[in-house]
From Swiss-Prot:
It comes from Chlorobium luteolum (strain DSM 273 / BCRC 81028 / 2530) (Pelodictyon luteolum). Belongs to the class-II aminoacyl-tRNA synthetase family. Type 1 subfamily. Its main location: cytoplasm. Homodimer. This is Aspartate--tRNA(Asp/Asn) ligase. It is an enzyme of class 6 (ligase). Coiled coil: none annotated. It catalyses: tRNA(Asx) + L-aspartate + ATP = L-aspartyl-tRNA(Asx) + AMP + diphosphate. The record marks 44 as: Important for tRNA non-discrimination. HAMAP family: Asp_tRNA_synth_type1 (MF_00044).
Length: 604
């Protein structure tokens, strides 16, 4: 544990006068009291050395054999027992200085030991961070949290939360807590429901996000709102998503445009990175990429811009081609996409077989490619192409001998996504700088999309976003061409948040829902309280809600979100430490007027 991670102002009492990680040569000769956990014990031929650990770090204790009772007691201590000691700070000899410890220039010669708590043998060691199953780590999370790396992750999370609060309060944001018990919404993920004892048959829902409350705060006249809000969604776990609950930095501002919000967020992320991390932001202000452009060039709306590959559109090249597979995908709504790997045209057959396997996993029927070798172009589709077509391709894509180009063809979105998946797959060929933070904004999302299953126009993302062009756009444009004031912020391929400038004008909202097939009565039934509020004086407003868990993950170089949460659930949405979820008594259910109707397999 580093001094930086756990620096404290000493609280002097009968247990301690100082902290382990903060002792140094400036304390030489002082009598001190320390309290903490036994990290390691070593018997070195007549001297017992104890590594004592507290929140700030480790300090080496020395127990001398002349003090027989102390020496005997020290020899009986187990790792992770909690002790308090008294002793004198002495300088280490030059050959015994430990540069890995903040207190490595001193040690404490012990004059008294008090055992506050004997520790039984642990389910896994703390001092030696051996590989331990996640199930065991989560069951004994209070022990796992003693380990240095995860302990520092939780400290870092606390400090970044405090830094966010300071930053926003300096910019006139007001922290407001919104309700945890609210009403269920049919949109989005599944709700966690809470039965009401006072209102039998009715349920509260835990909020998936404080979305409606924060917009109503704008209507209430609060100009800038934020909170670090718990959110609850009954959804499956992923490496970057915790099941059940997560925390987000929820923000909303009145009388703003999109650029105003971008300026606030970019400044905050730069401040946090510069002051709390060794990482660096490569481009500032953050690049802004339209949804159409990001799909065309990166095949995903969550691009990792560190990967030095871009997708090229080669559709016009195949309009009159004799290669019918590609020619048939040059009509409107379709595309032929290409991805060039420089200098990889001589890879083994296994390289291409693995790439094709990945393409099939992404939904492609196969993976067409052309290698440009010394002896000429090679590959499964070369025989279908003419010399002029091959030369035109070399010219457009600036191909050289030794390069290889991969293709995907089909509906525009499908072709983009397949090439985007291959871009990420080939990203492993490059050494990406883990300290580089490549942020970008994805903007200009389409307001509507065509729902193939329902055979109708539907909202593509957030139905409450303001359409670009407002009412005029809705009344005069093809719905599929209308763009929304929606935006995502992405870093290194991870989406940190979505946000939008909200639609605060009821007539525009009614019109947008009408295009998506909803009557005015349906809109009033579902969202009447919001529309009623907007009819009583609503300012233009917009917001965003970056995930705190994901932000800490990125800044701490963690691949799994459970490493930055103090008490996470496992992937089956279970808290193994607290044995949740659990059964409740029949009396509790009767009080709530609930009768269980379990699936057959659960009854056994």
């Amino acid at each position: 544990m580093t001094k930086e991670a756990g620096e404290l102002n000493a609280l002097k009492n009968r247990f301690r006068t100082d902290y382990c990680g903060q002792l140094g040569l400036d304390g030489e000769g002082r009598e001190v009291r320390l309290g903490g956990w036994v990290h390691r014990i070593r018997d070195h031929g007549g001297l017992v050395f104890i590594d004592l650990r507290d929140h700030t770090g480790i300090c080496q204790l020395v127990v001398q054999p002349e003090r027989e009772e102390l020496f005997e007691l020290a020899g009986r201590l187990h790792a992770e027992s909690v002790i308090t000691i008294e002793g004198r700070v002495v300088a280490r000899s030059s050959e015994t200085i430990n540069p890995r410890l903040a207190s490595g220039s001193i040690e404490v010669v012990v004059s008294a030991i008090g055992v506050e708590s004997h520790a039984r043998p642990l389910p896994f060691p703390v001092a030696d961070e051996v590989q331990t199953s996640e199930e065991l780590r989560l069951k004994y999370r209070f022990i796992d949290l003693r380990r240095e790396k995860i302990h520092e992750n939780i400290i870092f999370r606390s400090r970044i939360s405090a830094a966010i609060r300071r930053y926003l309060e300096e910019r006139d944001f007001i922290e407001i807590q919104t309700p945890i018990l609210t009403s269920s919404s049919p949109e989005g993920a599944r709700d966690f429901l809470v039965p009401s004892r006072l209102h039998p048959g009715k349920f509260y829902a835990l909020p998936q996000a404080p979305q409606q409350f924060k917009q109503l705060l704008m209507v209430a006249g609060f100009p800038r709102y934020f909170q670090i809000a718990p959110c609850f969604r009954d959804e499956d776990a992923r490496a970057d998503r915790s099941p059940g609950e997560f925390y987000q930095l929820d923000m909303e501002m009145a009388f703003i445009e999109q650029d105003d919000l971008f300026e606030i967020l970019e400044g905050m992320f730069r401040h946090l990175t510069d002051t709390m991390s060794k990482k660096r932001i490569t481009r500032f202000p953050f690049p802004r990429i339209s949804y159409r452009e990001v799909m065309d060039s990166y095949g995903t709306d969550k691009p990792d811009l560190r990967i030095p590959l871009k997708i090229e559109d080669v559709t016009p090249m195949f309009t009159d081609s004799g290669f019918k597979v590609f020619a048939s995908n040059t009509k409107p709504g379709c595309a032929v996409k290409a991805l060039v790997l420089k200098g990889r045209g001589t890879e083994s057959r296994l390289f291409y077989d693995k790439a094709e396997k990945r393409a099939r996993e992404l939904g492609s029927a196969g993976l067409a490619y052309i290698q440009f070798r010394e002896e000429g172009p090679k590959g499964p589709i070369v025989k279908f192409m003419t010399e002029p077509e091959l030369q035109a391709m070399k010219d457009q894509l600036t191909l050289e001998t030794g390069d290889v180009v991969f293709f995907a063809a089909g509906k525009w979105e499908a072709a983009c996504k397949i090439m985007g998946g291959m871009r990420t797959y080939f990203g492993d060929l490059f050494t990406l700088d883990p300290d580089e933070l490549s942020f970008c904004w994805i903007v200009d999302f389409p307001m509507f999309e065509y729902n193939e299953d329902a055979k109708k126009v539907d909202f593509s993302h957030n139905p409450f976003s303001m359409p670009q062009g407002e009412m005029e756009a809705l009344e005069t444009m093809d719905p599929l061409d209308v763009l929304a004031y929606q935006y995502d912020i992405v870093c290194n391929g991870i989406e940190l948040s979505s946000g939008a400038i909200r639609n605060h004008k009821p007539e525009i909202m009614y019109k947008a829902f009408e295009i998506a097939g909803y009557s005015r009565e349906e809109v009033d039934l579902r969202f009447g309280h919001m529309i009623e509020a907007f009819k009583l004086g609503a300012p233009p407003h917009g917001g965003i809600a970056p995930g705190l868990d994901r932000l800490v993950m990125i800044l701490r170089d963690e691949q799994n979100i459970r490493e930055v949460i103090a008490f996470p659930m496992n992937q089956q949405a279970q808290d193994l430490m607290m044995a949740a979820p659990s059964e409740v008594t029949g009396a509790q259910l009767r009080e709530l007027h609930i009768r269980l109707d379990l699936p057959e397999e659960e009854k056994k």
